[in-house]
Amino acid sequence: MISRREQEYKMIGLTIAYYRKLKGISQLQLAELAGISRTHISNIEAPNMPTSISLETLLDIADALDVPLSSLVDFKQ
């Protein structure tokens, strides 16, 4: 059974993938803009591999996507 925390990581990853695709950029382009590896972006976005993410990395990704941090973590609607 997936834990609540794992479910939250999964939702963050899916939200990042959504905004990345909406912006029309690849995982590699996002990784370069955020200053992290493409593999890390891939792991974060993978719904079958909930990956923890540091606040610093999350802020870097939000900046790279030009979205507020809250839009990446506000999935409780």
Language model features: what each stretch is:
Residues 1-22:
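A short, Lys/Arg-rich alpha-helix, primarily the initiator
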Residues 16, 30-31, 41-44, 72:
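Conserved hydrophobic/aromatic packing and binding residues within compact polymer-binding modules
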Residues 21, 32, 63:
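Alpha-helical residues within the helix-turn-helix
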Residues 35-51:
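Recognition helix of helix-turn-helix/homeodomain-like DNA-binding domains
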Residues 48-60:
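Short, basic-rich loop-to-helix N-cap that marks the start of a DNA-contacting helix
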Residues 66-77:
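Short C-terminal boundary/hinge segments that cap the last helix of small helical domains
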